Amino acid sequence: MADPEGTNGAGMGCTGWFEVEAVIERRTGDNISEDEDETADDSGTDLLEFIDDSMENSIQADTEAARALFNIQEGEDDLNAVCALKRKFAACSQSAAEDVVDRAANPCRTSINKNKECTYRKRKIDELEDSGYGNTEVETQQMVQQVESQNGDTNLNDLESSGVGDDSEVSCETNVDSCENVTLQEISNVLHSSNTKANILYKFKEAYGISFMELVRPFKSDKTSCTDWCITGYGISPSVAESLKVLIKQHSLYTHLQCLTCDRGIIILLLIRFRCSKNRLTVAKLMSNLLSIPETCMVIEPPKLRSQTCALYWFRTAMSNISDVQGTTPEWIDRLTVLQHSFNDNIFDLSEMVQWAYDNELTDDSDIAYYYAQLADSNSNAAAFLKSNSQAKIVKDCGIMCRHYKKAEKRKMSIGQWIQSRCEKTNDGGNWRPIVQLLRYQNIEFTAFLGAFKKFLKGIPKKSCMLICGPANTGKSYFGMSLIQFLKGCVISCVNSKSHFWLQPLSDAKIGMIDDVTPISWTYIDDYMRNALDGNEISIDVKHRALVQLKCPPLLLTSNTNAGTDSRWPYLHSRLTVFEFKNPFPFDENGNPVYAINDENWKSFFSRTWCKLDLIEEEDKENHGGNISTFKCSAGENTRSLRS
């Protein structure tokens, strides 16, 4: 049997009854106080001041209402600030603000629509247009939750706790429209400030019917210089746009100006060629002063120079009445719009490029590619070269052919013809006396030097190797290098003597030089190069070819050791013609050499000593020195008609 509820130890003799002893506080006959007198009359005088009707309560209520309204206004201001900073959340923030105000004005609807809130919010987010940036939906949803949790719930709790009646609800309803208006204005300001370029491009396409970016080639760097620029400006006064036609003349060689109206004034399109190259920063500063608009209201890019469509646009609009054109039309527009140029640009002639490289004496592939590309504006063949997808192969083939032609031409010439060709390519105005004065300063007889130099140039056996020796800083290398530079000879170094190909440059040279020959190098020459010093036929190992047999060109050597008298190399004594430079090379007070030796001075020297050096050959006497013919590797154009 279950224990009786509320008892402990049932069945222990408890019958359920207990005795209570009364506590007596007042006995019969004691005086009764007025507060406990039940027989006294109740007149109600003691409740007169029970309700306080003073002004303090009304003031406190008004204060609480004001605080509630201030809290609502603070929430609206915070929401507007968030909308202004984050433009892509503007639509979502606006709906959140409406929900906050609606829930604040109608607290009863909050609990009813609480279950439908998540579904409705997700549908609103899905309907938003993507701005093109990543994670838009996730960030927007987070923004809505933050707005509701920070503003909506706080405002709702404040309204419920404040106890404000219908007046508070009316004030909330009247602020809904103002909140929406402020939000739209902030959104407009954000669009104009944060995405100005996109807004300008949109207005440009709306006004001109063509995308601005289709006419230009964007530059990433603001420091890149260019002479031609394409500019569009937005929000320009009509009077300023009209005055631009006159103000821009002093800065430009060519201008193409179009002006159309839009909702914020005039929007212009300007194609301009400046008198000198300018970068984007300089152009923006100049146009900002001329148009009286900030630099952010302009888009500045260089035009497309190889687009035929863009060139046709500028060509056609230049003939219409909406354009104001001044100056000479740029050559790239003419090249892309004239029919003959279009035909020529599609045809590339390698022989013409080889002829150009030959005439300009360019044999290095890098120089050929760089300088020929610069001719694209004036040479149709160079423009076709730039359009080719095989530029590297073309440059390589051009360099190879040019080097072959130059090598064959040099082999064909005698030493006299080669010196004559070098003199023709050197400017006049030189003086031969510094060379003679330097030889006399080093105590060298000019007549003896001239006789040895004559045999040296002709390559007479045992006389085709000249040694200039002496102490350091006497001008040995200065004298020898100046001669090699004038005659376009080759310089070989003994540091490469362990290579099989270190003598390869001698196969293409009319004269060679080994500078600063050391005792180790003299030993190598004595062991392996005696026949080379003789001027006889030698065999040279050349890359990618079989051994080449050729006559060694004259060799000019400089050294601090006189191998012509040193007993360590007795077999070189008869093979070397030795001249000693004993005196230090003189300099003036400014550090310039007293005896200046350059190409012009060597030209004057050979001109004065031409006969003494016996450089005139029989063919030169018959043809009066005009035996060198002009080389042509490209086919000439026949300008004669078929009937002639």
Swiss-Prot record:
<dbReference type="InterPro" id="IPR014015">
    <property type="entry name" value="Helicase_SF3_DNA-vir"/>
</dbReference>
<dbReference type="InterPro" id="IPR037102">
    <property type="entry name" value="Znf_lg_T-Ag_D1_dom_sf"/>
</dbReference>
<keyword id="KW-0244">Early protein</keyword>
<dbReference type="InterPro" id="IPR014000">
    <property type="entry name" value="PPV_DNA_helicase_E1_N"/>
</dbReference>
<feature type="short sequence motif" description="Nuclear localization signal">
    <location>
        <begin position="86"/>
        <end position="88"/>
    </location>
</feature>
<dbReference type="GO" id="GO:0042025">
    <property type="term" value="C:host cell nucleus"/>
</dbReference>
<feature type="domain" description="SF3 helicase">
    <location>
        <begin position="444"/>
        <end position="594"/>
    </location>
</feature>
<keyword id="KW-1017">Isopeptide bond</keyword>
<dbReference type="InterPro" id="IPR027417">
    <property type="entry name" value="P-loop_NTPase"/>
</dbReference>
<feature type="region of interest" description="DNA-binding region">
    <location>
        <begin position="179"/>
        <end position="345"/>
    </location>
</feature>
<dbReference type="InterPro" id="IPR046832">
    <property type="entry name" value="PPV_E1_DBD"/>
</dbReference>
<keyword id="KW-0413">Isomerase</keyword>
<keyword id="KW-0378">Hydrolase</keyword>
<dbReference type="InterPro" id="IPR046935">
    <property type="entry name" value="PPV_E1_DBD_sf"/>
</dbReference>
<dbReference type="GO" id="GO:0016887">
    <property type="term" value="F:ATP hydrolysis activity"/>
</dbReference>
<protein>
    <recommendedName>
        <fullName>Replication protein E1</fullName>
        <ecNumber>5.6.2.4</ecNumber>
    </recommendedName>
</protein>
<dbReference type="InterPro" id="IPR001177">
    <property type="entry name" value="PPV_DNA_helicase_E1_C"/>
</dbReference>
<comment type="function">
    <text>ATP-dependent DNA 3'-5' helicase required for initiation of viral DNA replication. It forms a complex with the viral E2 protein. The E1-E2 complex binds to the replication origin which contains binding sites for both proteins. During the initial step, a dimer of E1 interacts with a dimer of protein E2 leading to a complex that binds the viral origin of replication with high specificity. Then, a second dimer of E1 displaces the E2 dimer in an ATP-dependent manner to form the E1 tetramer.</text>
</comment>
<keyword id="KW-0597">Phosphoprotein</keyword>
<feature type="region of interest" description="Required for E2 binding">
    <location>
        <begin position="312"/>
        <end position="644"/>
    </location>
</feature>
<dbReference type="GO" id="GO:0003678">
    <property type="term" value="F:DNA helicase activity"/>
</dbReference>
<comment type="similarity">
    <text>Belongs to the papillomaviridae E1 protein family.</text>
</comment>
<keyword id="KW-0235">DNA replication</keyword>
<feature type="binding site">
    <location>
        <begin position="470"/>
        <end position="477"/>
    </location>
    <ligand>
        <name>ATP</name>
    </ligand>
</feature>
<dbReference type="GO" id="GO:0006260">
    <property type="term" value="P:DNA replication"/>
</dbReference>
<dbReference type="Pfam" id="PF20450">
    <property type="entry name" value="PPV_E1_DBD"/>
</dbReference>
<dbReference type="GO" id="GO:0005524">
    <property type="term" value="F:ATP binding"/>
</dbReference>
<feature type="cross-link" description="Glycyl lysine isopeptide (Lys-Gly) (interchain with G-Cter in SUMO)">
    <location>
        <position position="551"/>
    </location>
</feature>
<dbReference type="InterPro" id="IPR016393">
    <property type="entry name" value="Rep_E1_papillomaV"/>
</dbReference>
<comment type="subunit">
    <text>Can form hexamers. Interacts with E2 protein; this interaction increases E1 DNA binding specificity. Interacts with host DNA polymerase subunit POLA2. Interacts with host single stranded DNA-binding protein RPA1. Interacts with host TOP1; this interaction stimulates the enzymatic activity of TOP1.</text>
</comment>
<dbReference type="Pfam" id="PF00519">
    <property type="entry name" value="PPV_E1_C"/>
</dbReference>
<keyword id="KW-0547">Nucleotide-binding</keyword>
<keyword id="KW-0238">DNA-binding</keyword>
<keyword id="KW-0832">Ubl conjugation</keyword>
<keyword id="KW-1048">Host nucleus</keyword>
<keyword id="KW-0067">ATP-binding</keyword>
<keyword id="KW-0347">Helicase</keyword>
<dbReference type="Pfam" id="PF00524">
    <property type="entry name" value="PPV_E1_N"/>
</dbReference>
<dbReference type="GO" id="GO:0003677">
    <property type="term" value="F:DNA binding"/>
</dbReference>
